[in-house]
Structure formats: C-alpha cells, structure tokens
Curated annotation (Swiss-Prot):
Lineage, opening ranks: Eukaryota, Metazoa, Chordata, Craniata, Vertebrata
Protein name: Terminal uridylyltransferase 7
Positions where Phosphoserine occurs in the chain: S132, S172, S600, S747, S891
Predominant cellular place of this UniProt entry's protein: cytoplasm
PANTHER family with a match to the protein in the record: POLY A POLYMERASE CID PAP -RELATED, TERMINAL URIDYLYLTRANSFERASE 7
Alphabetical list of Pfam families matching this protein: MTPAP-like_central, PAP_assoc, TUTase, TUTF7_u4, zf-CCHC
E.C. designation(s): 2.7.7.52
Zinc finger residue ranges, CCHC-type: 959-976, 1341-1358, 1447-1464
C-alpha cells in the first residue's frame, strides 16, 4: 500500500488492554481492523469482519455490497461515501452520532472483540478513493512545524513494517499462549504513568479563562464546527500539543489560528466539497416512474441509433464468408468464427469485426497468422493490411473494402470465444442486458474510458460489469454459476473450479480436486480427467420468478452501484460467484479496478487501467452521471403558450423595460445570484450571459429606483459607488422557466468570473402530503407551504470579446444550466433531503479555478452576512419549481456566434457604457399548494440524453504512459524506449585510435584470463571433492563446466560443478531436492569448506559453499547435463579464432564495470553476453566464426538428444577450413570488431523484432518464438525454450542499453591524449562514471539481505540460516552465558566494523549502500517528547542491528556484510578492483557502486 495506508499501532500493557484507545479513535477515526486467521496471513478468503455492520440511513436505497468482506469503514470509500458508513455530519445531533459511530465501530463490547480473534489485528486506514500517493503525503503536510514533526517522522519510520507489527501483536493479551510479553521495568512504567497523567488533563483549561474569553472561545469553536473541526476530549499521545481535530482531513490542530489557516487550505476545501457531493448523491431518492420512463427512452434512442441490428450482423457474417474464401487455398484445414460484439450484439454499428482462426494442432499460431497476413495482402476485398504481433493477443488488422469496417484476425483465441459465447447466450435469454450494456458502453465511449491503449478499460469489460451488477442486485436478475449448492464448493477451493463451456442455455463447470494446488490463485491448467467433476448451471432464472424491472431503473441502479456501493479498490468483479472476492485471495494488487474474465480467471482484464488519475476520472464520471439521471430533468416545450413572464432589467443611466408583446417561456441566463459584473466605461459588450432561473410566482412588478429596494421578495441593494446598477425582477407563472438574456460585459483582456454558493435551507413547518403521484416518491410536496431559501450566486460567466473564447463560454453555460437545474429539481424533495444536500449543489471539481481564486482577488462582490438572512426571510416570493429543460436544448456544438435576440428575451441594454453591476443577494422561494392540474404530471416533460459534457463536466482523462507511468504521452511515444534515442554520428576511426582499441582488448584478456596453474588448481579441487563425496554417495562423478572450462573464465571466478551418479543417465527417478539436502549435510563434514547453503527452490537445485584454501565459491548442481554441452560448444568457438576470446573478455570486463553482468541481481549473465558476442561475429560481413550447429557432412542434420534437445554441433575444429568456405576471410582487427559490436547492438539490431540465436544464420523473429513480451531475447543454443533475457525488467533493460550507447560514444570517438585523472587507457575506457552516467544499476527487484532477485528479504535463505543458527545457540543444552557472551562479542565486532567503514567512507567522500540503516531519531525539544521517542528508537536500532547481523559473507563466513563487500573479495589478485578500480578516478567511482 505504500504511503496510502501506514499502519498505526496501539501500545498495550499487561494490566489493562489498549492504552489510550479513546485517543486512538479520535486521532484516527477512519481506521478499522481486519481479523485474519493465522493460515491466511492476509491472503485468505476466510477473512471476517472485526466490527459490527452499520445500518443504512433511511434516505438511502439499494443494496450495499461494500459491506462484504470488510468492516464498515475499512474500505477507501467509507469516509467519503455516507451510503456505506453514515458519518456524523449526516444528522443534526452530530455530537452524539459521532460518539456512537466511533464507539460502535472501534470500541465495541468485550464479547464482540473476543468473538473475532483468530489472528493478529491489521489496521486499515480508510482513505478516499480519489486520494493518490501524493495526496496522502499532503495529508500530514500541515502538521509540519506545529510541534508534531518529530512524532510524525517516527510514526512513518518506525510503524511502517507489517512484520514488526505482527511481532508486537504476538505479545498482545489475546495471543499470550503463543508468546509471553516481558514485563516492563519499573522505571519505564513510572514514566508511562507520568505521561498518562499529563495526557489525562483537559485539553483546554476553561477554569483559568474569564467569562469574556470563554464566550469568545465558544463562539470560535461553534464556527469551527461548521467546518467539521472539533475540540479533542483528550490529548493524543502522538501529538500532545494538539487541541482540535479536523474530521474531514483526519488532522490534528494546535490552536484556533491554525484551525482557521487549515480551513483556508485547498485540501480542506476539496474534502469539504467532496463531502457535500457525497451527501447529495447518497441522499438522492429512487427515481419516480416518470423519470424511469424518460431514462428508458434515452437508452432506447441510443440503442436505435448506435446499436447492432439484424442487417448489421448479416453484414459481418458476409465479411467472414468472404474472408473464408480468401483463406481457403492457403489454410484449407482452418475455419473462421466471429467473436466479440459482432456475435453478442453488445456493441456498436462501427465496432471492429473480430474473427478468430481455428487451426489444427500440427500448426502454430505464428505460422497461421503469417499466412493470414500474406493472404489478405494478396486479396482485393481487403485493404490497409497490417499486423500487431507484439500485442497480448497477436492480430492481423485489415479493413473491409466494401463496408469500411475494421477487421482484426486472431488465431486460437479460445478464451475470448468462450466469453463471447457466454455473453451471447445471456443477451438472448435476458433481453434487458443488451440495451443496458450498449448504454454502458456508449457512456464509456463518450467519456473516453474504453481505450485500453490509453490507460482505459477494454470495451467488453463493461458487459461483465453489467452482468455482475444484475447478479448482485437485492433482487437479482441473473444467477451465479458457482455456489453452496455444489457439494465441494467453498471460497478456499474457488481456484479448483473453472467454467468450460455454454451448452443449451447452461454453463458447464468443472471441479478438480487439487489438494496441493495454490488456492490463492485460480487454476487455468487443464486438470486430469480422472479427478475432474463436471456440472451444469442454468444461465438465467425461471421467467416466472424474474421481477419486472424496466431498463431505465436498472441503468440508474447500475450507476449508483458502481459510484457509491461497490468497493472497487478492495474487491474483484467476478460473475462466477455471489460471494464477494477480495483481491488478496487472487493475489492482485489493490487500487483501481479488478475484473475477472470468467474463462481466464488468472488475468485481471482491467489491468490496462494502470494509473490513478484515470481511475479517479472514471469515478468522477460515474458520480456525475448518476447525479444527472437520478435528478428530474424537464424538457422545454416552445410550442406551449403561457402567460407572459416579464423580466425587467434596469441599468443606470440606461434603463429599459420590455413590456410589449408576449415574453418567451424560458430565458437563458447562465447563473442568477449574488454577483457583481463590472465593466470598464465605454467598452462595447459582446456575447451573452445566460443562466437558468427558477420559476417564480406569476407576479409582475416594475423595478424602482437604483436605491435599496424590496421588490416582490427579491432583495436588491444598489451600490451607490458604482457608475451603474442593474436590478432585475423575474417572475413567471406555472411550470415553465423564465428566461432572460443579459449582454455580457468585458474586454479582450478582462474576464468576469462568478463564484457560486448554494445554501438551500428549509423550515420544517406546515408540511403536508401531496396527492401528485410523482412527488409522493420524493417524500414531500412542491406545492406545500414551506419556506425554502434558495440562494443562487452567479458562477463563472466569462466575458468574451473574441471568437476564441466562445467555446469556453458555451461549456460554462451548459454546466451552469445543469447545476441550476439540479438545484431547482431538489425543490420537489423532502425538506430533510434539501437541508442535507443544499450545500453540495454547485460542486466544482476544477482545481485550476481554485488556484486562480487563491492567486487573484475575486472580481465579483459576494455579500453574504449573517444579518442579511433575517432580511431575506422577511421578503419571500411564493413560487414553485417544475423542472427545467434548458440543458437539453444546448449541446456541445452550439454556435456562440449567434447574435442575441433582444426582441425575444428580456434584454438588459445594448452597448452599455460605464460599470454594469448586478447584485442579487437573495432569491427566496415560498412554496404554496397549487391545484393538482398545475403539477407536473406529464411523463413527456422528463427528458434525458447522453452527452459527453453532461457526464464529464468538461474533464478529460489524463494520458499516462503504461511504460514509465508518467503523464503526457502514450507507450508508443515513451522517451524511455531505448530505440527512440537519437544517436550522434561517429567520426571515422583513425589508425592510431584503432591500435589503441586493439591494445585495450588484448590487455583485458591478459589481465583476467586464468593461468595454467589456476586451471590445474581447479581440477585438483574437483578431484578432492569427488573423492570426499564418494564416501557417502558411491558412484558419484563431478564434472567442471561453465567459465572454468569454456575458455572465457576469469581469475577467481566461481567454480561450477555438475554432479552425476553412475547408473542414472538422467535425473529421472531421483529426488533432486532431497539429494541436494543430503549432499549439503555431507559437505558440512569437510573441514576445508565453509558456509554450505543448499538452494532447493531454484530452477536447478544447487549447493553453494566456500572453499577456504583457494578462496573460490563453488556451486554443485545435479544433472545439469545441458550445461556441460553448452560448455563444449563455447569452448569450440573460442578455439576457432583468438579474436573470439579477446572480444568475450572485453565484453565481460565492460559488463562488470557497468554492473550489468550478474543475472542473480536482475541483469544478464556473463554466458548471455558471450552469446551476444558470438552472434555478432556470426552476423559480421564477412563472418568471423561459423554457425557450428548448421555444419554437418551428411544430407540430414544429425540428432543427439539430451533432455529432449538436439545437442549436435560440428566439433572438429581442425577440419573447419575445408567445411566452411568463409574461413579466414574476415581480417578486421579486434579493436575495430569491438567498436563494431557496440554499434551493431545500438544501431542495427532490432531487439523488439529479432532473437539473438547462435544456432542459425538466418534471422529469427520474436513473434516466431512467441517471446514478444520481453525486451532482450537471447535463445539458448540447445534448450530452445530458454530465454536468457526473460528476467530483465524495463529499468534494467534501459540501464544496459544506456551503457552500450555510452560505450559506443567512448570507444567510437578518437582522443589524442588521455585525461590526467585517468592515468591508464583501461581506466579511461572503462570508467563507470561515464558508461553509466554515475547511476547505480536498478536494484528494486533485489533482496535487501543478499542482493539477489527471485525472493524478498523475508524469504531470504541467508536469513533462515541465521535464524537456525541462533536457535541452535539458544537450545537448553548450551549454557546461556556462553551464547550470550558469543553473541555480544559478534555484535561488538559488527559495530566496530561499521564504525570503521563509515569513518573511511567519510574520508573518501563515499556513501556505502550496505551500511547499517539505523539512524537516531532527532530528539524533540521538550522532555515529554523525548520520553515518547526513546523506547521505539532503541527498539528499531536493535532491529536494524539484527538485520545487519543476518547478512553473511560467502567468502570469509563473517556476519554483517555480503561477498561483494568482503575485503578478501576486493583485494583478490586479478580481480577488477585490483586492476582498474585503484587507478585514478575509476577507483573512487567503482568503490562507490560496490559499497
């Protein structure tokens, strides 16, 4: 989880349970505990809720599956989604509610705590789902400098390890049986009691305050409560100086001034707005039947306009038939089948045509697609033929010439066909699914979130989401396929179940009893037929028992389900089971969306959504769309005749009153509210300023003088200091909107902005029921006597003097109309709903506007005071609201250049000079009962449409690269792709510089090649070990392989030994793991060996140990016979030409100096680089060496099978001149070849398209090998399934290629003289600071203990070995004093060693990477804080010391360091350290990398 969920630990004592539990609850009200069993360790599906469920508030509807596997507030949405856990601010008595909420969720009773205690309690911090990693860091930023900095640092540093938490929890009272917690010393207990005494005091001592001060404090705190900031009831232990807490931001505040500063912060404002928005969405009631009908009509229009119909399906079938005729000659045994939306009808008319080729088993997928590509290119029926063979599903893309539809042809895509077959059957049996999915997909298309290549979701995912929703409804419309009715079913065994096919409207499932299988992940492998059990489940319910739910209602419920109810961050969308599946059970990372394909259950099909901004954008669109469809929206009827609705706009000195002729029904004004629109004198107005007005009672009065007046309940104060004043009175009758059009004022350089606040208050007096059917569902009447104060403040109306700004104004008009319409729509809801949602109506998510508001003064006066409320309440206008359809009349393509029609609207003057000021402080609405015939009863008045701006509010998805995770570009344009690096041309190679390169290459061979004596010593070690092992393993034979025998070995390189047993040609019938463990036990008896370590989890089990006398590290593997033949092959190549050895040694020196030559640490092995050198020499023109595996004397290539692979190669090197015609033709010097190698791999060779393979001369494509997902592909010459570059990450690949590119520059640009800081040629050419640009090799995949990849620190074999040794030392048979003395002595040695190392590092100005990480925490100023910090710091010091002791060197056998840091290793003769790194600057830089 990283920074998004830092654990919080609770201190415990022996006498009482949780210390400061109240304090813990107040300081972290969003935390919850997950109770797990010991077996699960957080990844089992048997997770239980540790807290009681919260009841859903009465205002909510629909089921809430978020309460599935987690506690009420354990998900990231709980704090922002009151539907899930209703917070305190939802009720008026929020003090008591908050207290009850905390006590229910976190305290509970003793029985409830004891009921759920199968394992450790893991705290989960409830986070907003919109929070990213950066926002989580910002959540504590305000505390810096407030007296809590040191505590917060300690909190982040010391309490972030889950393992340490488990160890602490092991000592809790509920786990006393497992481990007894030692009693605290008396001094510590005394200090704790003193601390508790200090913290138990009042947060603010009111007894010392005067009456005036106390009154001021109460008033200030009442003001803070409105912003969700309350006084603490007790000082928190982690920040004793805090006095207040912000519930929204989960922040501690020291004083009232700091609280006011916190209120002004953008983070608090954002959280407040989000809270208001969530309140609005949560409290919206279900849509009325008339609304449902209107929503259904909107969906029907989408289906009719964009959906697939019978003629479209026939057209796609015809394309398939044409393609079959094209393939008939080249692929006679293959058949085609449609899949995707072309078959299921869950798509659009212009959707791609997906065609899959079924081919016989004798053919391979690459062969089939290459033939498909060839056929389509030669066909006249298809154009624009292209191939995308590097996609996850390789396809050939073309376009049908007649219809213009895009066709994608795949081969053997069985899972996609099964999923399509499933969805097709569901669409035929459940008719409501097709329009629901088409609407969902069209919504996604409008919002631009159905583009997986841009970080969105695959289109068919929305069909799975719709099916999942229909299964999870309170009254489900579709069944699930696996459940308790199956005898063997349980969530723990879900991985053993798989869906196989759809037959006769039923799903065929299969169960495999795999007791040894991993239940945490689903199994896709085909099980054995003998252990398989099959069954069938119907696809749909019985028609008689299905509820009749219209599509419009399902659409609104689907939006609510995913916007508010379902926990997308923690749960998996799976249509197989009814139970909710956690991500831990599938071992999928949290965050964003997880969707399981029912026929490919290992894969998260939503993993293309790989960035947080797009995820937040999807949630924004879901919430916005739900709010749009949940609120009533009316359609404007221009043909209806209504009494005139005069709108009088007065400007001084220009005043016009339009009284002649009928007024239009609706007037377009963007916003009406408390705003002042200023204009410079003499500036011509341009554009128009539109807003929707709520319908008022039909009263027509003239506006008086510019002085302060009270007219018809609209309070309009005039500003005398302004040059002009516009006062407006709006009145209309019935249910239609009054419309007024005001000329905008402004200039090219000035923008008029308006800010909206929308408190909608209701006095709950005199309410009675309405008989109108639509409004009964809302729980209140629009036509009842009620005092509803609706304050409308004009928002963001920009003056436009040029056409460039017109598009922006158009969007603001539409958005403003939408927000005002939603505000007025709430007038038909109950007063309680209005009061809870009033403050959230005009929610603005644009952060840019907030930044502008902070940077500049508002240009519009907003006069909101407490005194004005009473004045406004005295003058109310009787009114009612019947909805507005203005928004539907507008669209994204509205032409803003259309002139304003003054004769049709209330015009407020043209060419106004001076300052135009609109100051409408309040519009009060007073509802009265009206005749029933006047109420909106016609269903046709509700109108909805699918529009992008309505769903997105002007936002767009963030473009994030899936490769580097940075914003602003896509993967195909990623600058980190090494193929996109622009290489500078190299100057011509001079003869003098070429001679220098020759000398460098030859010197590398002379310096590092082993001598004859060393080769003899290695053979002697082999013989000695073989004779020793034979005593326990008779018939054992040891053989040297690898660098010791292939001709490319270094001095002091590892000794690789292969062990075989007479009578066994292969390892079949042998228990390799047990044999390796027994071999390790035997080798421990050898007095000349140290650090024997069996590694049985590797691909080839080995025993590692250290040979004392020679100082060599030895690896013994069992039946690694292919490696023996690889050694023979490389040895044969090294004997062909001496330049082969020179280049291979130069390559090995280059890779070791750049730290890219160790496969165990995530890079390539030296064997892989040797193959790269051989491949280059084979591809050179003319070639330096032949392809030995392609040279043979007979007509057919011989076969010599070992482990199922042909290991034949031409090994008669003496006869090579007669068998290979190219022998001796290449006479290039070795230096020129070395530079040519660097240029070949940086300029010519295409790593994406081709494979490095020394077994064939012709090029081999990555698609042919089906290794398209890897970065560097190197094929083993014998084991053709082994890719030596499979372990490379993107970071390491870029690091390797950067080294090659820099090497090309260093070795390719001639120099006249060498710099003084590089005294030798080798130090100049192999300077790691130049080759790697001073960067260290990526180690993010390496273990922190041993530095190897393939495991993490907790699974490190060296760590387990240390633990076993300590357990043996602490056995009762040994004396405690001796073991204690021994351990303390070792600890002192380690401490002295690291002290000396740090001193030497400071002298050399280096920073060692492996130094101990324990750093003393900076002590706080006051004494109480020192007491708080003392104990945890010492504990973590001991922890870090223990981690350093768990490191053990393979060479010297001592603890505290690894082989790379060993002085013996660095000082060994012939090593890189002694040769190059002690020469000038290279020594310093290299030491920095190695330490």
């Amino acid at each position: 989880m990283g920074d998004t969920a830092k654990p919080y630990f609770v201190k415990r004592t022996k006498d009482r349970g949780i210390i400061d539990d109240d304090d813990f609850r107040r300081g972290h009200p969003q935390q919850d505990y997950l109770i797990m069993d010991d077996y699960a360790k957080g990844h089992s599906s048997k997770m239980e809720k540790g807290l009681p469920k919260k009841k859903i508030s009465p205002g909510n509807y629909g089921n809430t599956p978020r309460k599935g596997l987690y506690g009420v507030s354990s998900n990231p949405y709980a704090f922002k989604n009151p539907i899930y856990s209703q917070p305190a601010w939802m009720n008026d008595n929020h003090k008591d509610q908050n207290k009850k909420w905390l006590s229910d969720e976190l305290a509970g009773n003793a029985d409830s705590w004891r009921e759920f205690k199968p394992g450790p309690r893991i705290p989960v911090i409830s986070r907003s789902r919109k929070e990213s990693f950066q926002e989580s860091d910002d959540a504590y930023r305000w505390q810096e400098g407030r007296g809590c900095r040191a505590v917060r640092r300690l909190f982040q540093k010391d309490l972030s390890s889950l393992e340490a938490m488990s160890e602490m929890e092991a000592g809790s009272p509920e786990n006393k049986k497992q481990r007894s917690r030692p009693r605290k010393p008396r001094r510590t207990r005394t200090e704790d009691s003193e601390q508790d005494g200090d913290l138990d005091g009042p947060v603010i001592d009111e007894s010392v305050l005067s009456t005036k001060e106390l009154l001021g404090l109460q008033q200030a705190e009442e003001r803070l409560k409105r912003d969700c900031i309350d006084r603490l009831k007790r000082r928190p232990r982690n920040c004793p100086t805090a006095k207040y807490t912000c519930k929204l931001c989960d922040a501690l505040i020291d004083s009232i001034p700091f609280a006011h500063k916190h209120i002004k912060e953008k983070r608090h404002k954002k959280n407040l707005k989000e809270k208001q928005e969530e309140e609005l969405l949560t409290t919206l009631p279900p849509p009325a039947p008339s609304q449902i009908h209107a929503v259904g009509s909107a969906i029907d229009r989408v289906v009719q306009e964009f959906g697939l119909h019978s003629e479209n399906l026939d057209q796609r079938l015809e394309i398939k038939r044409v393609m079959e005729s094209v393939f008939r000659h080249k692929l006679p045994d293959c058949s085609l089948r449609l899949y995707g939306s072309s078959c299921s009808r869950l798509g659009f008319r212009d959707s791609d045509v997906n065609i899959d080729v079924q081919f016989p088993a004798v053919m391979s997928q690459p062969d089939v697609l290459l033939l498909v590509q060839e056929c389509l290119k030669n066909s006249d029926s298809f154009i624009d033929v292209d191939a995308d063979f590097h996609a996850r599903v390789p396809v050939v893309v073309c376009r049908d010439k007649q219809s213009g539809l895009l066709c994608k042809v795949s081969a053997g895509n069985e899972n996609a066909w099964l999923t399509t077959k499933h969805l097709t059957a569901l669409g035929k049996l459940e008719p409501r699914l097709v329009p629901l999915v088409i609407a969902f997909r069209y919504w996604a298309k409008l919002c631009s979130i159905d583009r997986p290549e841009e970080g969105g979701l695959p289109p068919y995912v929305f069909a799975l989401m719709a099916v999942f929703f229909l299964q999870q409804r309170k009254e489900p419309l579709l069944p699930v396929y696996l459940g308790s009715w199956i005898e063997e079913f349980s969530l723990n065994k879900l991985g053993n179940f798989s869906l196989k096919d759809v037959e006769k409207d039923s799903v065929v499932w299969e169960y495999t009893d795999n007791s040894t299988g991993d239940t945490s992940s689903a199994k896709e492998e085909a099980p054995k037929e003998t252990a398989a059990k099959k069954g069938q489940v119907p696809l749909t319910f019985n028609i008689k028992h299905q509820p009749s739910v219209p599509v419009g209602q399902l659409w609104v419920e689907l939006l609510r389900f995913y916007a508010l109810e379902f926990n997308l961050a923690d749960l998996v969308i799976s249509i197989r089971v009814k139970e909710l599946i956690s991500r831990e059970s599938k071992d999928w990372p949290k965050k964003r969306i997880a969707i399981e394909d029912p026929y490919s259950v290992k894969r998260n099909v939503a993993r293309t959504l790989n960035n947080q901004p797009v995820f937040e954008y999807i949630l924004h669109c879901l919430r916005t769309t739900y709010k749009y469809f949940a609120l009533p929206h009316k359609v404007t009827k221009p043909n209806l005749t209504k009494p005139p609705s005069p709108v009088t706009c007065v400007s001084d000195p220009y005043r016009e009153a339009k009284n002649g002729g009928p007024e239009p029904q609706a007037t377009n004004i963007d916003k009406l509210g408390n705003a002042a629109v200023a204009q410079d004198p003499g500036v011509q107005t341009s554009g128009d300023c539109r807003a929707q007005l709520v319908t008022l009672k039909n009263t027509t009065e003239e506006v008086g003088s510019p002085a302060k007046e009270k007219t018809g309940g609209v309070h309009i104060p005039a500003h005398q200091e302004s040059s002009g004043c516009v006062q407006a009175e709006v009145s209309c009758e019935g249910l239609e909107d009054a419309t007024a059009e005001l000329p905008e004022t402004g200039s090219d350089n000035e923008e008029v902005r308006r800010k909206t606040k929308h408190p909608l208050s209701t006095d709950d007096q005199g309410l009675s029921s309405s008989k109108h059917p639509e409004l009964q569902n809302c729980g209140s009447l629009c036509g009842l006597q009620a005092d509803n104060t609706l304050e409308l403040v004009a928002e963001e109306c920009n003056s436009c003097a040029s056409l460039d700004n017109k598009a922006e104004v158009n969007e603001e008009r539409i958005e403003g109309a939408e927000e005002l319409e939603e505000a007025a729509a709430l007038s038909c809801f109950s007063p309680s709903v209005q009061s809870r949602t009033s403050a959230a109506m005009h929610f603005d998510d644009e952060e840019e506007e907030e930044e502008e508001e902070e940077e500049e003064e508002p240009r519009l006066s907003i006069n909101l005071t407490e005194d004005e409320e009473g004045v406004a309440n005295e003058h109310q206008v009787d009114s009612r609201y019947a909805g507005s359809g203005e928004e539907d009349a507008l669209s994204e393509e509205d032409d803003l250049a259309e002139p304003a029609k003054g004769e049709d609207t209330g015009e407020c003057g043209e060419n106004v000079g001076g300052t135009l000021l609109i100051d409408l402080n309040r519009i009060t609405l007073k509802e009265e009962s009206f005749p029933e015939e006047d109420l909106p009863g016609d269903q046709s008045e509700f109108f909805y449409e699918f529009r992008k701006l309505t769903f997105t509010k002007g936002k767009s998805p963030t473009v994030v690269c899936s490769l580097c995770k940075r914003e602003g570009h896509l993967k195909k344009d990623c600058p980190e792709d090494f193929k996109r690096v622009q290489l500078e041309p190299l100057p011509p190679l001079t003869p003098k510089f070429s001679n220098i390169l020759d000398q460098v290459c030859v010197q590398c061979y002379k310096d590092f090649s082993p001598t004859i004596v060393e080769d003899q010593a290695r053979e002697h070690i082999r013989q000695n070990l073989e004779s020793f092992i034979k005593q326990d393993f008779p018939g054992t034979k040891l053989s040297l392989f690898g660098s010791s025998k292939n001709g490319f070995g270094f001095k002091q390189s590892d000794l690789d030994v292969c062990m075989t047993i007479n009578g066994h040609e292969t390892a079949e019938g042998l228990d390799c793991v047990r044999t390796i463990e027994e071999l390790a036990r035997v080798l421990r008896k050898h007095s000349g060996l140290r650090n024997i370590l069996p590694i049985t989890t590797a691909k080839v089990p080995i025993v590692k140990f250290f040979h004392l006398r020679s100082g060599l590290e030895v690896d013994i593997s069992l039946y690694n016979t292919l490696a023996l033949h690889n050694t023979r092959l490389l040895s044969a190549y090294s004997a062909i030409d001496p330049r082969v050895k020179y280049l291979c040694y130069t390559m090995k020196v280059f890779t070791k100096m750049c730290d890219i030559g160790d496969a165990s640490r995530g890079s390539l092995s030296s064997y892989a680089y040797t193959l790269m050198v051989l491949y280059f020499l084979q591809q050179r023109s003319p070639p330096v060496i032949p392809v030995l595996q392609e040279i043979y004397k007979g007509e057919k290539k011989p076969e010599i099978l070992v482990d199922g692979w042909n290991i034949y190669f031409f090994d008669q090197i003496n006869e090579l001149p007669t068998c290979w015609p190219e022998y001796g033709k290449n006479t290039e010097p070795v230096g020129q070849l070395w530079l040519g190698l660097l240029r070949f791999y940086t300029e010519e060779f295409d790593f994406k398209e081709h494979v490095i393979s020394i077994r064939r001369k012709s090029l081999l494509t990555t698609f042919k090998k089906q290794w398209t997902s890897k970065y560097i592909v190197i094929e083993d010459p014998f084991d053709l399934n082994h890719n030596l570059g499979a372990g490379l990450s993107r970071k390491m690949t870029n690091f390797i290629m950067k080294a090659f590119i820099n090497g090309r520059r260093v070795f390719g640009i001639p120099v006249k003289g060498f710099p003084k800081d590089n005294p030798s040629k080798l130090a100049y050419f192999f300077d790691p600071d130049v080759l790697t640009e001073g960067e260290l090799a990526p180690n993010d995949r390496c273990c922190r203990i041993c530095g190897k990849i393939g495991h993490f620190m907790k699974d490190c074999p060296m760590r387990r070995k240390v633990r076993r040794r300590r357990d043996q030392e602490d056995t009762p048979n040994q004396r405690y004093s001796e073991s204690k003395e021994k351990r303390s002595k070792e600890d002192k040695e380690i401490q002295n060693k690291y002290t000396e190392k740090e001193v030497s590092t400071k002298e050399d100005k280096l920073t060692p990477c492996a130094a101990a990480k324990a750093k003393p925490v900076r002590a706080a100023v006051d004494l109480g804080r020192e007491k708080l910090l003392r104990t945890p710091t010492e504990k973590w010091k001991r922890q870090d010391d223990r981690d350093s002791r768990e490191k053990r060197c393979f060479i010297c056998g001592r603890e505290g360091h690894i082989k790379k840091e060993c002085p013996q290793f660095k000082g060994s003769p012939g090593s890189l350290s002694s040769k190059y790194m002690t020469q000038g600057r290279a020594s310093v830089k290299r030491t920095q990398q190695e330490s």
